[in-house]
């Protein structure tokens, strides 16, 4: 029985799922909007929102925690220099999920997940994780 087990399995083992969400979190921080399936977008919220909350208070310890979760120095830099100050007064809800129809190949429900208050010039990046 799966009582009280949170999170979606997404037909992957735990290391694959962890690596996929680490890569997707880096992509959304880098590009501020990505296109993926609705289920992956809803799970990605649970990874990205704590990272942004961590970035709201800049310290060496928090930067090391963020690096441990993302393994990307460029992403950590953007988190603490741009996103942390941008969301300083927002108590949560840093992401928005916009549904965008069905995928052509298998009719999977697709969605854009974006950071709230992003500059409008940023273009969407397709998610290649399958």
UniProtKB/Swiss-Prot annotation:
Biological process, per Gene Ontology: translation
Q: Which Pfam families match?
A: Ribosomal_L17
Q: GO cellular-component terms in the record?
A: cytosolic large ribosomal subunit
What InterPro entries does the record tag this protein with?
Answer: Ribosomal_bL17, Ribosomal_bL17_CS, Ribosomal_bL17_sf
Whether Ribosomal protein counts among this entry's keywords is yes
Q: Which domain of life is it from?
A: Bacteria
Which UniProt keywords are present, listed alphabetically?
Answer: Ribonucleoprotein, Ribosomal protein
Disulfide bonds, paired cysteine numbers: none
One GO MF term = structural constituent of ribosome
UniProt keyword Nuclease present: no
Q: Which NCBIfam families match?
A: L17
Which family does the entry's similarity section mention?
Belongs to the bacterial ribosomal protein bL17 family.
**Quaternary context:** Part of the 50S ribosomal subunit. Contacts protein L32.
The name this protein goes by in its record: Large ribosomal subunit protein bL17
Q: Which organism is it from?
A: Shewanella halifaxensis (strain HAW-EB4)
